[in-house]
Amino acid sequence: MFRILTINPGSTSTKLSIFEDERMVKMQNFSHSPDELGRFQKILDQLEFREKIARQFVEETGYSLSSFSAFVSRGGLLDPIPGGVYLVDGLMIKTLKSGKNGEHASNLGAIIAHRFSSETGVPAYVVDPVVVDEMEDVARVSGHPNYQRKSIFHALNQKTVAKEVARMMNKRYEEMNLVVAHMGGGISIAAHRKGRVIDVNNALDGDGPFTPERSGTLPLTQLVDLCFSGKFTYEEMKKRIVGNGGLVAYLGTSDAREVVRRIKQGDEWAKRVYRAMAYQIAKWIGKMAAVLKGEVDFIVLTGGLAHEKEFLVPWITKRVSFIAPVLVFPGSNEEKALALSALRVLRGEEKPKNYSEESRRWRERYDSYLDGILR
């Protein structure tokens, strides 16, 4: 029996769980108030606070850290790497502590896991961080050599659901072609070809369909005009793209349940905006089907919005079901995804990857691509 501790720090919470093989023994979501987090100037300053919570969770459950077989966390904002399970190493910790790719609470998970590993000798892993990059070079070309398309998406849930579909069909993930749409506060739509995400919208930086809180792809000239209008600061413009865009901008809420309630009460404007979001999601699914040359085994809808089966899921399904059968996997169980990934490594079913080596290889390939684009 393998005992696994999962560590999943989010912006306003820390989710911790204990698994014994596939069975979840305990899970707890610790919410953090603005007052609690407000005393920390930087994300990294929260490290001791979050680590203490994890230690207390383990102690109160009656286990010692040395009784675990593995510690596993979300990957933070690392350098781009292919998908998979990675052994936490010194370069990874250095990258996360530097914040060179951005500061996010998810950066803390691997650092905490590494501390526990250093104390006990138990291995620490991260799984499919948001920076997973398996894009083909043709997908990186943006339309101008000074700008490159980036792969930033919900890699953990996307890969987990894709592998679950393959398992259901008695196939390997590496044998299937899928279009997977993760629909939550951010929306990522990816083309999975034979085990690799060869194209995906950048779910964070203003690319793809609009979402409950993000604007998605916008008309560029209008955006440039607004940037130089003198009416908004740099930070205000960024907030319009991520945070105050999408449903928030149109309807004043990011809660799909509230939007559905308004639609049922006869709010035609809410219905029009919500239908437009479904339209854009469907359009991006069509784009990814084209990336796969129409050879799509299944279209998969997942994430929190996939629970909304009165309007959103039917509207999307009606537009894309001609491409391939549509499967719906509501929500995203990141804790289970982390634990099962670590379990595959512990059982010898999957080899952990080396972050230092894989990030170096990715950089060499990317530099070669840039040489071709910029020459």
From Swiss-Prot:
User: What are the annotated GO cellular component locations?
Assistant: cytoplasm
Where does it localize?
Cytoplasm
Q: Which UniProt keywords apply?
A: ATP-binding, Cytoplasm, Kinase, Nucleotide-binding, Transferase
Q: Which Pfam family, an example, fits this chain?
A: Acetate_kinase
Give the top-rank taxon of the lineage listed in the UniProt record for this protein.
Bacteria
> What Gene Ontology molecular-function terms does this entry list?
acetate kinase activity; ATP binding; butyrate kinase activity
The protein's matches in InterPro entries, at most eight in alphabetical order, are given as: Aliphatic_acid_kin_short-chain, Aliphatic_acid_kinase_CS, ATPase_NBD, Butyrate_kin
What is one Gene Ontology biological process annotated in the Swiss-Prot or TrEMBL record? acetate metabolic process
Reaction it catalyzes: butanoate + ATP = butanoyl phosphate + ADP
Cite the EC number: 2.7.2.7
What family is this protein classified in?
Answer: Belongs to the acetokinase family.
Name listed for the protein in its UniProt record = Probable butyrate kinase 2
Organism the protein comes from: Thermotoga maritima (strain ATCC 43589 / DSM 3109 / JCM 10099 / NBRC 100826 / MSB8)
